[in-house]
């Protein structure tokens, strides 16, 4: 996909929205903003952006697990329903995309 001139700013806007929603306790909204950032980073093959999404998803889940364990997608709540947390799945998705991207050093 060709680079859109505003793709980088869209990525940053998604991260800003994620942080604002997370700070306000709107965890599901924060998740979706972070997922949107993941899709933008993937489209741009932005390894730094993908790594940032992976890190943020993991960090935010850790905070949720401590401060809001009753939230439906905390580790405890998600596992009680037999599923992993959506934040964990987002971190794993970012990791999987990173593994599939071409090596930046030009390896084939």
Residue positions per predicted region:
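C-terminal-biased regions
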Residues: 1-20, 27-108
